[in-house]
Amino acid sequence: MESVTLSLPEAYDLALEVLSANGFSADHAAAIARNVTAGERDGCASHGLWRLLGIVDTLRKGKVSPDAEPQIHDQAPGIARADAGGAFSLLAYERALPLLLEKARHNGIAALAINRCVHFSALFADIEPLTEAGLVGLACTPSHAWVAPAGGTRPLFGTNPIAFGWPRQDKPPFIVDMATSAAARGEIQLHQRSGKALPEGWGIDSQGQPTTDAAEVLNGAMLTFGGHKGSALAAMVELLAGPLIGDMTSAESLAWDNGAGGLPYGGELILALDPQRFLGAQAPEQLARAETLFMGMQEQGARLPGERRFACRQQSERQGSLSVVHCMMRFAPCARAGKARSAATRMPVKTACRARPARCSRHRPAATSSTYQRSDTGARCRTAEYRRPAHRCPAPGAAYNADP
């Protein structure tokens, strides 16, 4: 398969330039570029640069705001809320994260509800900042109704990912990030692009018959993992990140899309728990017991969740480059143009998952170390002069099938 090799800074520049050229504000473009570059760096091609195609397509269809400023609300002692205003979720999460961390450390447990957001990204990027802060994290979000319930033949659930993270001292965190469907939808789309057959059990066609044809599954329905067990977990996500936080279910998201083919719109729920507040002086001892569990898994030859991703990250950072498949070749000249820039003007991709000041012609990021740093109030400016008509999206609980 044809590919192009990009350095990590070039990959970030590619994403940033594509997003900016299509009308995203500086802050949103930087947040999205950090995320898709991190996915590519970590070997998660289904959530890497390839996602730019769907991101730009959703904007062109008027299904996402390119410049909405997130509104952060201190709702209750243990609850923070971020209204994304119809934009992608990433910037809203970055802006709300300091409040979530503060509440978790004060109360021992805290929740963040992100409302009115368009979502495409892997949840490990939302969980990892919590584990880096020494917290346990849990996140979930619905999507579009693409998945049939166990025993059913028509889409009702979304892929409904769940992510869980556990902090570890001087080691990569233990992070589970999984769809409740048998596979992520992006994986099926990549199979379709490459002409590969799907594994059995991933989906059914429009007549409810099992199939390994990716196109037939995309036109029919995906299946949950583990039959009725995955179906129950998918229903749980619908409730937790839908009605509980006043936002859409996957079926409502698809109805709101009204056939446009945009990315899912709705809410996300993130929980943060502080072991220090739960355990006090016993925290080191109890966290050490968790390490015994991990060792027991590895001694039997089991691979810890996230282990492959962190290995890919180390390899990408060691090599300093990525091989991007042909579906991104159309953007290669844009990335190559970035070679003429000084390295000091490029975003350090090693910390791509973390919030940083947006990059524009007036505010360039300074070189930083490889440790994770977060700027909560970093310099930001808006340079994208292109503006689309104002994006309109329903408030939670509104008529979801309204013409957008």
What are these regions (language model features)?
Residues 2, 6, 11-14, 250-344:
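Catalytic-core signal marking the mid-to-C-terminal active-site face
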